[in-house]
């Protein structure tokens, strides 16, 4: 039951700090046990926001969260998060690779929590067809549907931009000019050498050539760079013009 893991995917900087399983809708005793367990984790990990999936027992879990926050004296907020496709992700090969130590319920909880942090970064991991937007989408030929939905996802990713120091391979491979291989190489380089401190440093990534850099640079953000334009949609080729303005 996915409701047993609701709100438990407390994530900070893309890392899972703690997990537990509670049963807040199985009676008053179980609800109070859930409040005690979650309150302990909230204090331990300095949690400030709770993500509650909008699926089974969402309202009952919300009521428990309100009671818990009141007992804590405030300082914590919650939000109802659309969990469409979370169960599909939790049973996927990608989820198993990311969280081999967790069962599908805990993977779903992490996915729901991360959607509150960065919705786009999490939703790109899910087949767009599983999100269920549009009741007649499956009347289209599957190949054409995949191409259309994939194009929309990539357009969204490029329009928003991607933080190269936090993005997963699933998100990076949606950036124009990058492939699955170069996306994985970016993450591997980041893990081995530390965060990127400039867009120029992206050229050091193995198998990411000048053409690929030219295509992807404007969509990759580097917040830690001393060059302020590295954290904007301005392409390096236009830095001189932007600086003059």
Task: Give the label of every model feature segment.
Residues 30-45, 49, 56-160:
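Conserved phosphate-handling catalytic cores of large alpha/beta enzymes
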Residues 9-10, 16-18, 49-53, 77-80, ...:
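Structured core elements
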Residues 6, 62-65, 198-201:
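Short beta-alpha junctions and helix-cap segments that line functional grooves
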Residues 13-24, 42-46, 92:
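Gly-rich Lys/Arg/Thr-decorated short loops/hinges at beta-loop-alpha junctions or inter-strand turns
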Residues 3, 40-42, 203:
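Structural motif
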Residues 1-8, 12:
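Single conserved hydrophobic/aromatic residue that forms the stacking wall/gate
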Residues 20, 25-31, 159-245:
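Accessory alpha-helical DNA-binding modules that contact the DNA backbone or grooves
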């Amino acid at each position: 039951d996915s409701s047993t893991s609701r709100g438990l995917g407390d994530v900070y900087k893309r890392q899972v700090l703690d997990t537990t399983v509670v049963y807040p809708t199985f009676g008053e005793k179980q609800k109070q046990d859930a409040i005690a367990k979650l309150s302990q984790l909230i204090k331990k990990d300095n949690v400030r926001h709770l993500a509650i999936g909008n699926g089974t027992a969402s309202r009952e879990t919300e009521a428990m969260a309100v009671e818990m926050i009141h007992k804590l004296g405030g300082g914590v907020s919650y939000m109802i998060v659309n969990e469409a496709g979370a169960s599909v992700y939790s049973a996927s090969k990608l989820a198993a690779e990311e969280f081999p130590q967790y069962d599908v319920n805990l993977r779903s909880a992490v996915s729901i929590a991360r959607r509150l942090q960065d919705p786009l970064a999490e939703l790109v991991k899910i087949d767009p067809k599983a999100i269920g937007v549009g009741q007649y989408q499956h009347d289209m030929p599957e190949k054409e549907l995949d191409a259309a939905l994939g194009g929309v996802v990539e357009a969204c990713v490029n329009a928003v931009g991607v933080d190269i120091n936090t993005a997963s391979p699933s998100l990076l491979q949606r950036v124009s000019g990058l492939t699955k291989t170069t996306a994985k190489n970016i993450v591997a380089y980041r893990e081995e050498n530390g965060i990127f401190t400039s867009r120029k440093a992206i050229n050091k990534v193995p198998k990411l050539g000048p053409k690929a850099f030219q295509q992807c640079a404007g969509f990759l953000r580097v917040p830690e760079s001393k060059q302020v334009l590295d954290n904007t949609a301005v392409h390096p080729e236009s830095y001189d013009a932007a600086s003059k303005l």
